[in-house]
């Protein structure tokens, strides 16, 4: 089942996550939460913020999720395609959970949270980048960019955690491509935003669009893998 699920998750990546940064620091934060009260009902919440300004919000059931860009980062036609892709991803994501539940009895409610982003420190210091995944309110795994490795965020040793780390650390996409997304794409975008904060025009618009698409593809590819591994194990110790 896992070998079937992982490629689907890796290829179905349309979603984004984020957290509000109200103090206006030079950073990009992304947060996404999926709340399953049972196998058939899910409520999504998410947002993206850049330098303390919300850029996107997402909320609602998978059958009628409201997705809004709060700043005109994409032209209407382009944004409509993004919305459609994201809606498709959410429906597929819910379908995967139901499929796994049919084969393995999962404990509900189930809440999955991913939080990632980059923060630019004072000049001369290294940027702080991160990706954290929590399940049912408890820290699960997180990414360490220094060695491009995932590590456990729980003191409880279990087969589920061990298996998850083995899988996440086995793929270039979930290691080196993720590090590149966080340390390069994310950081460079924030830097460009700072230098062109008061500039309006096509160059800025293209940068925004590129970053938005990067967030949609990059963040949920990794989150989907982590979530899929957890669901495939049924949330139980192996």
Curated annotation (Swiss-Prot):
The keyword Cell membrane does not apply. Disulfide bonds join 118-186. It is a single-pass type I membrane protein. The chain crosses the membrane at residues 211-231. It is found in: Membrane. It comes from the Eukaryota. Residues 1-17 form the signal peptide. GO terms for molecular function: signaling receptor activity. Keywords: Blood coagulation, Disulfide bond, Glycoprotein, Hemostasis, Membrane, Receptor, Signal, Transmembrane, Transmembrane helix. Gene3D superfamilies: MHC class I-like antigen recognition-like. One of its GO terms (cellular component) is extracellular space. It holds the Pfam family MHC_I_3. Residues 232-238 are cytoplasmic. GO terms for biological process: blood coagulation; negative regulation of coagulation. Its main location: membrane. N-glycosylated. A soluble form exists; probably released by a metalloprotease. Seems to have the same activity as the membrane-bound form. Glycans are attached at residues 47, 64, 136, 172. Expressed strongly in the endothelial cells of arteries and veins in heart and lung, less intensely in capillaries in the lung and skin, and not at all in the endothelium of small vessels of the liver and kidney. Residues 18-210 are extracellular. Binds activated protein C. Enhances protein C activation by the thrombin-thrombomodulin complex; plays a role in the protein C pathway controlling blood coagulation. This is Endothelial protein C receptor. The gene is PROCR.
